[in-house]
């Protein structure tokens, strides 16, 4: 019937699927669907616990926050791994984390926390460096 008002073709339709015979789909977590390693469900639970007045938290918000946390963690670990490799050790210590974070300008402004056992960055004032270099040049000219 031309108007779309009429009986269906009968039987069960495939619902737009290409093959009618498929088993049940395997369950995937939100993290697996988003291609993340960090747990979206746990982050969503923390977001719900820390909001005031029992606010609702959308699933996409939790995925977004999880992706940001995962990216920042990967960035810090990559820089800390490079710092450890430069010092020819295989284990990342708080000192390597400190060197990595303070060495990157954007991470330094983001993470203003004090890192336990991180030490301090080596820094010598330029005025002092100039005096030392001038003395070395004077000794080199005398010799």
Swiss-Prot record:
Transmembrane segments: none annotated. SMART domains: H2A. The modification N6-acetyllysine is found at residues 5, 12. It holds the Pfam family Histone_H2A_C. PANTHER family: HISTONE H2A (PTHR23430). Residues 1-37 are annotated as: Disordered. This is Histone H2A.Z. The nucleosome is a histone octamer containing two molecules each of H2A, H2B, H3 and H4 assembled in one H3-H4 heterotetramer and two H2A-H2B heterodimers. The octamer wraps approximately 147 bp of DNA. H2A or its variant H2A.Z forms a heterodimer with H2B. H2A.Z associates with the vps72/swc2 subunit of the SWR1 chromatin remodeling complex. Also interacts with rpo-9/rpb1/DNA-directed RNA polymerase II largest subunit. GO terms for molecular function: chromatin DNA binding; identical protein binding; protein heterodimerization activity; RNA polymerase II cis-regulatory region sequence-specific DNA binding; structural constituent of chromatin. Its main location: nucleus. Belongs to the histone H2A family. Acetylated once deposited into chromatin. The keyword Transcription regulation applies.
């Amino acid at each position: 019937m031309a108007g779309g008002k009429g009986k269906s073709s009968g039987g069960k339709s495939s619902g737009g699927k290409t093959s009618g015979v498929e088993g049940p789909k395997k369950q995937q977590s939100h993290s697996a669907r988003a291609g993340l390693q960090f747990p979206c469900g746990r982050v969503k639970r923390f977001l719900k616990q820390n909001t005031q007045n029992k606010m609702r938290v959308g699933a996409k918000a939790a995925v977004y926050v999880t992706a940001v946390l995962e990216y920042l963690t990967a960035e810090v670990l990559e820089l800390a791994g490079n710092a450890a490799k430069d010092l020819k050790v295989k284990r990342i210590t708080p000192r390597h984390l400190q060197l990595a974070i303070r060495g990157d300008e954007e991470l330094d402004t983001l993470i203003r926390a004090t890192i336990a056992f991180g030490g301090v960055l080596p820094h010598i004032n330029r005025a002092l460096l100039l005096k030392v270099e001038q003395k070395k040049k004077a000794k080199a000219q005398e010799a």
